[in-house]
Regions:
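A structural signal for small-residue-enriched, beta-sheet-centric alpha/beta enzyme cores
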Residues: 1-84, 94-383
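Generic structural marker for isolated residues within well-ordered, non-membrane alpha-helices
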Residues: 90
Length: 383
């Protein structure tokens, strides 16, 4: 179950020496074709990392032969030398695979403002290219982890075609992708414009709705590569739906492993005048530290939910708002509903349902609680 499940892909993960302790920290994913179509979406942070700059440029023509990824260093805020380092990573990968550097995307994750150890990385790329195999997907997924505790992978099987994916990201999760590196592969025979449209829609309903801590990374990257090796061209809508489902699976895995969390929270907003309103309300609640602390404390504090809703520009009437926690409607018509003592928040998963009674649109935002461990982990994370 990995990026090498679809036909036409190989991968590898190696310990290049970027991290301490002989941990896997560099990965290569290679597309063997016969098609080399690709698409990408990236962080909307205006302070973006050198590998984001590089990858935006090379994916613009809709063609990729490989992706090289490293953890242990973001290569962000490193100036012109950092961009040259990203290019050198692509060049080394291209040399190892016999392709052009302009056909290789680059992704990095880790500390900001630190140059990468290029001697170790170049050597690691050489070894990774030599070790590429159909069995290398698990090592590749492990190599891109930073504060993640488990690798994130998913697969979808269509009629004669498939999609595979791997992701990393445990902190700085916020709409706009989420400190994420995601590589998606498919053996469907699709052209780049179809991939681009599908990826943007899939990201919109998945990664863009994951919001652990409201912080947007400099390095967010989601790449989709198609080998065409199956020879099957699925209907574009069928493919988009399948890709969206797989990305939602990966987004849930990211939230489940978010730094220091003790609850995974799904904030479902219904009865909105527009999808934008539903997303806006969900995100505002998800970013409320008071709300997140209440969940951590096992308190279904619907007042904090209403307070967060009230600062948005969404269409609603305050005396028509309903809020439920895990199926118990604790707020009805903007006031007191069922006793909050009926709500059980002892489990890891929490479902918050907000009905605006203003229309038919809906959206679900995924988030986490705010814990002592989250503060400790981020306070101790080296800068």
């Amino acid at each position: 179950m990995s990026v090498t499940t679809p036909a036409g892909f190989t991968a590898a993960g190696v310990a290049a020496g970027i991290k301490t302790g002989d941990r896997l920290d560099l990965a290569v994913v290679s597309n063997l074709g016969p098609r080399f179509a690709a698409a990408g979406v990236f962080t909307r942070n205006r302070v973006f990392a050198a590998p984001v700059d590089w990858s935006r440029r090379v994916v613009a023509d809709g063609r990729l032969r490989a992706v090289v990824l490293n953890s242990g260093g973001a290569n962000a805020c490193t100036g012109r030398p950092g961009f040259e380092d990203a290019g050198a990573m692509a060049e080394a990968t291209a040399t190892g695979l016999g392709v052009r550097a302009g056909e290789v995307a680059v992704c990095s994750t880790g500390l900001i403002g630190v140059r990468l150890p290029m001697a170790e990385i170049t050597s690691g790329i050489e070894r990774a290219c030599a070790q590429l195999s159909r069995d290398g997907g698990e090592d590749a997924a492990t190599a891109i982890m930073t504060t993640d505790t488990v690798s994130k992978q998913a697969v979808h099987h269509g009629e004669g075609w498939s999609i595979g994916g791997m992701a990393k990201g445990a902190g700085m999760l916020a709409p706009g992708l989420a400190t994420m590196l995601v590589v998606l592969t498919t053996d469907a025979d699709l052209e780049a414009p179809v991939l681009d449209a599908a990826l943007r829609e899939a990201s919109r309903i998945s990664f863009d709705r994951a919001d652990a801590d409201g912080c947007m990374s400099t390095n967010d990257t989601v790449l989709l590569l198609a080998s065409g090796a199956s020879g099957v061209t699925p209907d574009s809508q069928e493919f988009t739906t399948a890709l969206g489902g797989l990305c939602q699976d990966l987004a849930r895995q990211l939230i489940a492993d978010a730094e220091g969390s003790s609850h995974e929270i799904a904030i479902e907003v219904v009865g909105a005048a527009s999808v934008r309103d539903a997303e806006t309300v969900g995100r505002e609640v998800a970013r409320s530290n008071l709300f997140k602390c209440a969940i951590f404390g096992g308190d279904p504090n619907w007042g904090r939910v209403l307070s967060a809703i009230g600062v948005t520009d969404a269409v609603f009437e305050a005396d028509r708002l309903d809020v439920s926690f895990n199926g118990v409607q604790v707020c009805r018509d903007g006031g007191i509903g069922e006793p909050r003592e009926l709500v059980d928040l002892s489990g890891r998963r929490v479902h918050v349902l907000i009905d605006l009674h203003a229309g038919d649109a809906a959206a679900t935002i995924l988030t986490t609680d705010l814990t002592y461990e989250y503060v400790k982990e981020n306070a101790e994370y080296s800068s």
